Amino acid sequence: MPEEQPQQQQQPVREQPSNPDDVPWKKVWTINEMRDSAKDWNLSSDAGLLNYMQDFANKLIYKTKELEFQVDELVKDSKSIHVKVHNTFDQFLMLSNTQFIENRVYEDNSELNNEQNEQTDKPQQQEITEEILIPKFSKAILIGLEALEKANFVNAALEISEQSNSNNNNNDYQQQMNGSIAASSAEGGLVEGGEQAGTDAQPSANTEKKKEKLDHYLRYPLPHIIGSQQFHQDDFCGLFIEDSDSDSSDEEDEEDVDAEDGSDESSSESSSDDDDEKDEQQQSTLFLTDEQPKQQNFFFQDEDATSENNANKKVSESLFEDEDDIFGDKPVASKKSSNSYTSSLSDILGGDDEDDLFGGSKKKQQQQEDADGDEPTKKKDPFADELNNTLSSKNKGGDDDLFGGSSSTTTTSKPKKKSMFDDDLFGDSEETPAPKSSASRKVTFDDSLFGDDETALPTSKKDSTTTSSQPQQKKTLNDLFTDEDLTPATKKETKKSSSLSFLDGMDEDDLFGTPKPKSTTTSAAPTATTTKPPTPIPDSDASGSESTTGKSSPAPKKPVGGVKLFDFDAAGGDIFSGKKVGTGGKSSPSPAPKTESKASEDDFFSSDKKSTSATKKDAEIFGSEGGLLDVPEKKIKRHDPKKYVDSDVLGIDSISSDKNKPKVQDPFGVGAAGSNDDDSFDIPKANSKKEQETKPTKSTTTDDDLDIPKAPTTATTTTTTKPAVKKSTKSNFFDFEDTDSPLSSNKKSGGDDDLFSFDSSKTTTETKKQPITEEPKKKQDTTTTPSIDPFSGLDIKKPSEASISPASPVSTIESDPLFGDIKKPVAQKPKKTNFFDGDLTKDEPAKSEPTKVEPTKVEPTKAEPTKVEPAKVEPTKVESDKKESNPLGGGDEESVFGDFSIKKNPTTSSSTTATENKPAVKKSTKSNFFDFEDTDSPLSSNKKNDDDIFSSTTKKSTTTTTTTTSSKDFFGDLDTSSGNKKVEEKKSSDFDSFFSGSDDPLGITKPKSKTTTTPPLTSTTANIESDDPLSLGLPTFTNNNNNNNAKPPPPPSPLGEDVPSPLTSNNTKNRTKSIGSMFEAQQQLQQQQQEKNRSESPTSEKAEPTKKTSNISSLQNKLSLNPNMFLPGSKMPKKKKEESENEDDSSTNNDNDSSATDLSDSGRSSPSVTSPTLSGGRPRRNTVSSRNNNDSEESEPVKELTHATASRPKSGGRRPPTRKSGTSAPNRSESPTPTQKSDSESEKVRSSSPITTKPVVSEPTKKTISNTSFFDDIPSEKTSSGKSSPSPTIKSTSEKVTIDPLGDIFASTTTKPTASETKAALSSAPKKSEPETPKETPKETPKEKEQTKEKEQPKETPKTTTTKKSTKAVETKSETDSFFDDIPDIISRPKASVKSAAAKKASSTTKPVISDDIFDDITSTTSKSTTTTTTTTTTKAKSTKAVDNLFDDDTNTTTKATPTKATPSKSKPKAKNVENLFD
């Protein structure tokens, strides 16, 4: 029925919804309805029953699902907690790794703990006693009386059964006990030992003999259970037995033997009672073991169930002999148990006291009970042994008694215990308790309770503090309140009782015995309290008046016991637990309640009172008597102080927050920059970014190390030294270039994002760290803060993005190869460093930056990578990008660039050719062609925009006036007006700034960048043409240059051979020679010059840069100071000057290299080849062809890059365009003719090429690794696709056909100038052309703004616009288009118009059709001249135009700010072309 009713209730609810028509068979019937219709059952009833069953099943399923859901929630919560717990573990482990954590094993000095507990307890107890003791005593007495009433029945039965046996045994035993113990304690001893004495009196000799036989084994308790508290507390794990331990174990063993003997001898006392008691003991032991936490249950159950074994015997003895013993002994037992709970320390003290109450009686009783309690004691012995061991381990002097050992009196009581035990347990001391047991049982509750209560109280006090045996209950009472009485007899008994209570006491006081294990386990410290607890028992046991009087006599001591009593008695066992409360409460109040309940077996009082008062003790002792708890808590803290808590709280919070950062910085920073990078990545990237920005100095070295390991391992060491410089520079440059470029490139330019995202992903931290180092060097060289500031502002925001960007590495296929090759990077980075320093810097800002920071150092490092590159040149064959770029940069970065720059310089004019050849050499020396343009364009597109943008923009602006004239004019103006020195300086500064701020670094940097970067260029270019989406730009660009898109991939290995066939026009021939020489010669030179550069490179390369752009670079340096200030850092100007000198030297070196040998590879040999082919154009073409290992167009980009490297000031802004911008920039700087002065000036203004170049130079390493990433980044700038972002130069290429290889990028830039090519490029890559529009209104509004501003500024002054716009472009780093926007604006500069004629002439000579195509694309963007379209493939003259156009387009694409007034009209049409190309 009850089931039916709830169902009925639920059913009506379902009836309503289920009764649409109130049809009986459609509604869910209730049970009542079914019951009513049972008589008239029909189909409708069946239907209703079915509905009811279905409804019931649905409800059941619903509830089941709800329950399942709840279970799932619980599982989820539990799993989350599990995770949290393990996270906490991990935090601790991490803390332990970072912070020393000491794990100590503390030995609790029971005596000290007891003394402290007593000291603390006495004043507190005195304060508390008057107010609290009276109610507690009254409660304890009431509970005790109830327990006594229950015990009286059991005791009466036990007395009746045992009187016959126990009387004789007790008499004999009393005599023995009297001999050993004082007469006053004789009754107590009889009470305690009565039963045991009865059993042991006669067979004591047998028991002793048996014990002696068994002593060897009994002496050795089983070791502690592994993992148990005792196991941890005991240094010897219970294996080593000290004297006290052995004694206690012997006593326990004797008790066990006595239990065995007792089982045999129990018939003498009363076999029936013993059997009953055995059953009771087993039950009580079950209660103890199972219900130890339940104190009241133990007391009542044990007492009810018993008189249980020991409780019946001991309690009966104590109750019968001395009801004081009942009160005294039981309270002592309760105290003992409570003490054991309260503390393992209290086990020692309380063990003695309680053992006195229980212990003496227990041991004696247990010996008698051994027959009864053999099995239970044996069962409990393991626990008892462990408890004894723990107590003994605590006392390592180890009193035999568990309690005695820990009690302050244990030391004295130990020998006494031994004598007691020797007499009782071992000797015949058990027999002495026997008379006591008989007497105690005979001494009925009435006498012992009230008559002997006073005596019992003092005895219990004595027992508790002195651990005196129960036999002298008066002493125990005194001991309760005072620890003074240390009667040896009582002590001996107490020790016995303690050991018995633990071992045999487990049987009697399973509550008591097991509590002791708990007490020992629960707290070692509380043992001190155990001594005191016994005293309260007599108090409570004594009638209210007597107990108070008994306590009053020890009143001064009683306050201590009283307080303890009250503390424990708070629950109700106050009298018994009085001192226990004090001591036990202090030691461990919570354990005390448990022990009290167990102790209450012996003391019915204590069992009830303690059960209640034990809980109250916890509350009151802890609450009201805070002192008691305070002491145990303090003791617990001694154990627990666990430096974990403080260290955890401090360590986890502070270490996790503070230490993680500092340690991450210090450990990782100290640990090799690599760890910092790892930390940066491991640490939340936001944190790592911030830290890295702050840390960049540390992380720069680590980034360099990381990047270098990723790239050439050799470079890593040098880069690590360099990072110091890089740090400061990177902060600006890095924020500006690397941080911004990775971030902004990721944000701004899709393609740049790929490059930069690759870098940022890879070296987001690295970019932050390393680029910063690069910037300082660049700053040192250029000392232009303006560029840094605009970018640093952007960079700071972007650094976080940069850290986020690590995901972007996937964005560009090229970048992926870079990072996929990061393991390979050793070869690739050098390659890309050669091909693009910008990409390397971005991909691996650290590496490229290392080169920048200290070119000299970086160059040796790169020189080693260059060696790797020669090896990689073959891999590059496997990977067209890497292989081809290796040949270009592989032979010698210097030579590769030198060749390119030499070609461009010759292109400019015959007179300019000499000067420009030097710049070209300079470029080749630096491998800045790749480093400069590629590194500059990808990296500087955002970060090094000023250098790349400006260098490329200047070139673009050159083309703006007239394609044909602008190329020559562009270079001629820079070279003639400004002098070739400025152009050379600008180029050298570009290289230097690209690689590092100092000339010496340039020397080193150049070899590295050249060796590492040039090979990547060629290989990357070839691969890009065939493989990369960027190749789209090249294919269209290949329309003129690139019939060879298929061929360019093969050319990489035979660059020279394949390229000629790819090239349809003169470019092919020039390229063929240059490319062949490039790859073959460069590979050789890379090996040779890498060695040379390692030894000589610092000086030779330094000299080479100066020669490269000595005249042009001087003008460019002057012009480019402002833009460089904005982009890489203020250090760039220094590099310009240094580079100008170095470039002069390097130009001579390049000339020597190119003329003397093809060591410069195609790049340097190409100048010689180029000059014969064309005054200025062939060398460029050769350089381009050398670049175009895969593509004839690539060779042109190579030229452009070479020139860009030479005139890095120009290409500083162009770095995002990378190859294209680099290519156009080199053409401008190398073709520099009289017109080149103005161009170089405008270029300098547009892009402080030295400044930007330096950042670019440092970047090459990373970009070398990520050739594809460079182009991907640039195309992505121009268009969301990685192709369009290539940056200004790349802009046109990516516009037409997202240039697959780097060469294609340049080719597309070349095509871009040409109207027809622009159209083709638009058709091939319409998406890129539109993105290219970023100049005017590309993807990003900031770019548009920059474009508009730049366009306006170009009209006013090309130079200023260049710097301003370049900074703006840098500021708009977040958008890839900004780089291109800056570049198109640069294209429209009047500079370009001035230089266009000379630059085109130079480019026609230096750069054949391919370079023309590249420049044509650029020209079309800056100043659309349809001539360049045709010139791309038609003739050398046209190729010069194309070269000019390339530079113009590069300039336009490179920097928005660079375009001058002349460009605005042209830049807009070219911007359209750029848009088309990028679309």
Swiss-Prot record:
Which stretches are tagged as biased composition: Basic and acidic residues?
A: 595-620, 765-781, 839-885, 981-990, 1091-1107, 1327-1358
Q: Which residues form a coiled coil?
A: none
| Organism superkingdom | Eukaryota
- Please name the gene that encodes this protein: washc2
Mark out the compositionally biased spans (Low complexity): 1-17, 334-349, 465-475, 514-532, 709-723, 951-968, 991-1000, 1010-1021, 1147-1162, 1277-1292, 1419-1445, 1452-1466
Tell me which family the UniProt entry assigns to this protein. Answer: Belongs to the FAM21 family.
Phosphoserine: which positions carry it? S1249
> Where, per the database record, does this protein carry Phosphothreonine?
T535
Subunit details: Probable component of the WASH complex.
Q: Where is the composition biased (Polar residues)?
A: 542-552, 802-814, 904-916, 1062-1075, 1108-1123, 1163-1174, 1220-1236, 1307-1317
Q: What does UniProt give as GO cellular component?
A: cytosol; early endosome; phagolysosome membrane; WASH complex
The terms under GO molecular function for this entry are: phosphatidylinositol phosphate binding; retromer complex binding
Q: Where is the signal peptide?
A: none
The protein's name is: WASH complex subunit 2
Q: Where is the composition biased (Acidic residues)?
A: 242-279, 422-431
Specify where the region named Disordered lies, as residue ranges: 1-25, 188-210, 240-564, 576-1383, 1419-1479
Record-level GO BP terms:
negative regulation of actin filament polymerization; protein localization to endosome; retrograde transport, endosome to Golgi
Q: Does the keyword Chloroplast apply?
A: no
Keyword list (alphabetical) reads: Phosphoprotein
Native organism is: Dictyostelium discoideum (Social amoeba)
